Each structure stands twice: as C-alpha cells, then as structure tokens.
Regions:
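Conserved Nudix-box catalytic region and its N-terminal flanking loop in Nudix hydrolases
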Residues: 32-35, 44, 52-92, 136-137, ...
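Nudix hydrolase/Nudix homology domain
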Residues: 1-6, 69-73, 82, 109, ...
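Internal catalytic-core helix/loop-beta-alpha segment
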Residues: 81-113
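Short conserved catalytic/interaction loops centered on acidic-Pro-aromatic/His motifs
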Residues: 102-110, 117-122, 136-140
C-alpha cells in the first residue's frame, strides 16, 4: 500500500540529469528542457512449458501522479549502468527480476528503439528468451526493496491484455507482445 506521499526537490540523482538545450534551427534560437538518462534493456520472456509471456508489475511514482494507483506492467528490464555488454545486463535482469538463469547464448536480440523522445531520448534494446522450469533458480522479485511482482500472461490473452487500457503498461511491453504475436511460430519452435 502506498501512503504518505509528498513531493520534494531533487537536488541530486544517480539516474537523471535535468538540462536545457539551446540550439538554432532555421536561424531561430530555441530551447528545450530534457533529461539525460541511462539507456536500457528489456526482455520478452516466453515460458515454453506454460505458453505464457512473463511480465513484471511494480510501483512507478510518475504513473501514480496520473492515476493514483501507480502500478505498471512491464517487460523484465533494467538500465545500462554497468561496464557489461547489453546481453549480460539482460541476463542479470532476467535472474534478478524473474528468477530464471538463462544461458547468454539463448538471449536473442530483437531490435532497439528510442523511448521518451520528448524529454529523454534514451535507447531501449529489446531481447527475447525462452524459459522453462529447469531454468528457475528463484522466485525473482528484484533486488533490495524493488518489490517486483512476476506475472504470467497466457499467449491467448496477450492481445486482449495489450489493449486493456485499465492496466498501465509500457510501450516496450506493447511492442514486445505485438512482435511476439507476429513472430510466434519462429519463437516457439526454436
């Protein structure tokens, strides 16, 4: 339960750096407020035994400001803030958030895209991995106080879930589910 919410000034952050860009475009001086942030990885996890897509549900304060709930459904994901390859970071996030130990060579890159283009312009790289119970080493849930809930969505319900506006979800999840449904035969037959 979320309570005792208050807004305070952000004097310093390890995750964001607010900036104002000045530039000339067509001989006009313009300014744009933006936030420098880390890039990220996201992983679409397909549970081959249960025929489900694994997502995480967690509290996101900015979403709370909009809907007074704040819980979002997202792909397993993490920021790129370590001196490791993107696939190594994806590997760590799968283990930490969802509890599966997936061999690096079984985590396949799908594509990358820009997110939050109006204020951040970070790049998210999407991966896909098949998992099964033999790979499960923990219940997941994140590290420390992340309070991540692991949820499985049946493949049959994926399209309806994607379009359900009552559940806050990220564009990365929506794109990932759409990509999976378009490429289901290839992913499930590997």
């Amino acid at each position: 339960m979320i309570k005792n919410v208050k807004m305070i000034a952000c004097e310093h952050s390890d995750y964001i750096k607010p900036k104002r860009m000045e530039y000339h475009q067509n001989n006009l001086l313009k300014t744009w407020d933006l936030v420098e942030v880390h890039d990220s990885v996201a992983i679409l996890l397909y549970h081959e035994e249960r025929q489900t897509l694994i997502v995480v549900r967690q509290f996101r304060p900015p979403v709370f400001l909009k809907n007074q709930d704040g819980y979002t459904y997202e792909l397993c994901a993490g920021i790129v803030d370590k001196d490791k390859t993107l696939v190594e970071i994806a590997h760590e996030e799968i283990l930490e958030e969802c509890g599966f130990l997936v061999p690096l060579e079984q985590i396949e890159r799908v594509t990358s895209f820009y997110t939050a283009v109006g204020f951040a312009g970070s790049v998210q790289t999407l991966y896909c991995a098949r998992v099964n119970e033999s790979m499960r080493v923990s219940e997941g849930g994140g590290i420390g106080v992340e309070s991540i809930e692991v949820i499985e969505i049946s493949v049959e319900d994926a399209k309806v879930f994607t379009m359900d506006e009552t559940k806050a979800k990220t564009p990365g999840l929506m794109f990932g589910f759409g990509w999976f449904l378009e490429n289901r035969e290839v992913v499930t037959k590997r």
